[in-house]
Amino acid sequence: MDEKFWEKINTFGENGEFDKVVREIKKLPEDKLDIELINILGRSYMNLGDYENALDTYLSFIGKAKEDVKDVDIWLYSECGWLCNEVGDYEQGLKYLLEAEKLGRDDEWLNTEMGQCLGRLERPEEGLERLKKSLKLIEKEAPENIDEKIFINSEIGFLNGVLENSEEALKYFYIAKDLGRNDNWIYMHLWLNLENTKGKEEALKYFEDEVKANDKNSVLWESLGQIYMNIFQDYDKAEKAFKKAFGLSGDGLNLYNRGIALRLLGKYEEAVEVLLQSRKISVQEGDVTDGEDLDLARCYVALKDKKNAEKYLDLAREGLENVPEEHADEFEATLEEIEDLIEKL
């Protein structure tokens, strides 16, 4: 390809005009396509959310490279496997990854991808075998890749949890945490497996000791707040934990959770104040507000403020389209419940 062609392709890519990248490459005769162009075309389809054409692009080039056919095909099968896994087609993804393995690929990336895939296919023992192999391989291939080590240890912990091997799960979750993982996912999985092995009170003690030692960790405070609120129904401690988490992070989700805790404590006026602040942050960040609207409607019902209760119920109803499908029925039932309560005011 001439320099002008590549300038055009690069400009379109930098501007996010991936439809134009596709159009330019599709104009080319088939014999002009090489692995570089196939890669760009496939990635452009992915950026457009067109995973089917991305997959077809990669599959169509298998066996057609003019040189290094085996290496190119390994890359193509690997890419197809990764792509299928990204869209949740783990069965097909595994087939493509196995094809890459048959051609000779046997590195950390492939084993990690296959381990994750097998886990999602409810084949945890096989997944663990692959992931443990990955841990050994990464020490040889990229010992400095901490993020990948965190991921592998987290997946091994998760699959052990699936198998109800909580002691073994904890071992790997602790490693992931010590390597730097600090999110709700790791803390909730630590909670579940600590609860299974030591009981709720001991599990709670672990988290309370952790926040004492890491008082500035907003994520840890948020996780503790969730434990207080959802496991122990201790809304007073939950409210204080979420307040601390928000003070450290400024994350509106912590403010929202604090508002829920205040509502559950019956402190409706304070809850309204906090939920309105949370809603303002959500609007500023372009986020949905259906959760705040629903809880505001509940608070205004409790305060016998029919006008505002109706206002936020209507806003919550408008947000129904943003609710994940698996929660839509529950959300609609809650809307109807609040509507009935408003009618009685």
Residue ranges and their predicted role:
Residues E3, E36, D71-W75, W109, ...:
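Start-of-helix register in tetratricopeptide repeats
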